[in-house]
């Protein structure tokens, strides 16, 4: 399961990082982008065993972004991506709480703007539902995954 979550994080990262963040002022965009950039640097340049403390700090920053920009779907998407990365680092059953939190953030983002970050929320949710085990362990469901990815 640890490897699957790492792959999931990579796919989410690939789909979302190259997307433009929109509908925010340039200064707001820069603040959200800085957190996203810190996450990208951590994810790609540090060994996995060194990522967790930084990801936890980024998670707190993402929570602050949500408080500062409660209507910005992009802040929720970044928070969801960070939670996915933390889940990949934790692995096993302890990661399930993180992926549920990630799903919650992404669903909130999609309620605000389903096309934020070029519709990355659909890709994130599709991957979460596809990669995770189904009931009774988690919420994985291939049919739901397909509905988000199509």
Q: What are these model-derived regions, one by one?
A:
Residues 59-101:
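Mid-chain, structured segments of secreted extracytoplasmic proteins
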Residues 47-63, 95-105, 138-143:
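Helix-turn-helix repeat elements of alpha-solenoid scaffolds
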Residues 35-47, 85-94, 117, 128-137:
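Short coil/turn linking the two alpha-helices of tandem helical-hairpin repeats
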Residues 6-18:
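Bacterial N-terminal signal peptides
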Residues 21-60:
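N-terminal leader/linker segments that initiate helical-solenoid repeat arrays
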Residues 72, 116-118:
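Residue-level recognition of tetratricopeptide repeat
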Residues 42, 58, 65, 87, ...:
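Alpha-helical solenoid scaffolds that mediate protein-protein interactions
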């Amino acid at each position: 399961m640890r490897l699957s979550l790492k792959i999931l994080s990579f796919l989410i990262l690939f789909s979302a990082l190259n997307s433009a963040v929109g509908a925010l002022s340039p200064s707001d965009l820069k603040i959200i982008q800085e957190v996203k950039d810190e996450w990208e640097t951590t994810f790609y340049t540090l060994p996995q065993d060194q990522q967790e403390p930084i990801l936890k700090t980024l998670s707190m920053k993402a929570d602050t972004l949500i408080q500062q920009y409660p209507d910005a779907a992009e802040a929720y998407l970044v928070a969801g991506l960070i939670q996915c990365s933390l889940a990949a680092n934790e692995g096993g059953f302890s990661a399930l709480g993180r992926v549920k939190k990630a799903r919650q953030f992404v669903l909130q983002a999609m309620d605000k703007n389903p096309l934020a970050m070029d519709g990355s929320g659909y890709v994130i949710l599709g991957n979460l539902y596809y990669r995770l085990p189904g009931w009774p362990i988690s919420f994985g469901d291939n049919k739901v995954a397909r509905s988000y990815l199509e």
